[in-house]
Design a protein with these regions (language model features):
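Extreme N-terminal starter segment of soluble prokaryotic enzymes
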Residues: 1-3
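Active-site rim helix/loop that mediates acceptor-substrate recognition in acyltransferases
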Residues: 21-64, 171-194
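Beta-sheet entry/capping signal
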Residues: 43, 72, 107-109, 195
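Conserved beta-strand in the GNAT
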Residues: 45, 51-61, 74-79, 197, ...
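A short, internal acetyl-CoA/4′-phosphopantetheine-binding micro-motif in the GNAT/acyltransferase core
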Residues: 75-85, 114, 214-223
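Conserved acetyl-CoA-binding loop-helix of GNAT-fold acetyltransferases
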Residues: 77-80, 86-99
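Conserved active-site alpha-helix within GNAT-family acetyltransferase domains
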Residues: 103-107, 113-131
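Amide-forming acyltransferase catalytic core, primarily the GNAT-like/NAT-type
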Residues: 129-223
Length: 223
């Protein structure tokens, strides 16, 4: 088994495997992912019989950790073609990626697995459960609250609002920036979703997700 990090021009070659393994993802979302995320991520792959048969993606994030900034990678899109499973490809990819991140001085990495048990043998442990706030068109809102669909022009204000909220409540979180929300708006739109902004007296008081029903009921986490 040979594992290697793909060159920028090779990353698109993993799209076929992604579409095959993550068939529940819409075409528009996959197109978004391969247009946007491949700009700055890393992809490790195993090639056999002339094709990529397994892969692991490292998507970069800037985290706030006890008041300090840390550049870390989010492990995602770990996949092996069905006919090539149980050959140790996933373990090999994880070990290679973890060793490389350690060598680069990265303090830690994180992922949001479909099943916790898959990653326990690699010393991953649950540190938190993700809670998302969803928009309900039938909910009663406080008098004076105005709800609008988020657009790129709102991204800077959204980032400032969420940074203030997260700083007060969490020791570890993904840093919010204008670019973060511009990308997130585009990401939700790719799957038919919208971010809703709640404002009172001209100031943001909340941000919620308006998404398809299956996403609300426990679909894939956003990346």
């Amino acid at each position: 088994m040979e594992i290697r990090k793909l060159e920028t021009e090779e990353k698109q070659n993993t799209k076929k495997l992604y579409e095959e393994v993550f068939s529940e993802d819409s075409k528009s979302f996959v197109d978004y992912y391969y247009e946007e995320k491949l700009k700055d991520n890393q992809i490790y792959a195993v090639e056999e019989d002339g094709e990529i048969q397994a892969m692991l993606h490292l998507n970069p994030y800037e985290l706030a950790v006890n008041g300090s900034k840390k550049d870390v990678n989010y492990i995602v899109a770990v996949a092996t073609r069905e006919s090539y499973r149980k050959r140790g490809y996933m373990a090999g990819l994880l070990k290679q990626a973890l060793n490389d991140m350690y060598a680069d001085g990265e303090t830690f990495t994180f992922l949001m697995p479909a099943s916790e048990s898959i990653y326990l043998p690699f010393d991953f442990r649950t540190v938190c459960e993700q809670n998302r706030s969803y928009y309900d068109p039938e909910e009663e809102t406080e008098e004076g609250v105005v709800i609008t669909d988020a657009v790129n022009a709102d991204a800077e204000e959204m980032a400032a609002y969420m940074e203030a909220q997260l700083t007060q409540s969490y020791q570890v979180y993904a840093k919010r920036s204008t670019a973060y929300y511009e990308r997130l708006i585009k990401e939700y739109a790719s799957d038919g979703g919208i971010l809703k902004i709640y404002k009172k007296d001209g100031k943001i008081t909340d941000i919620k997700i308006a998404a398809e029903a299956e996403e609300v009921d426990g679909g894939k986490p956003k990346i």
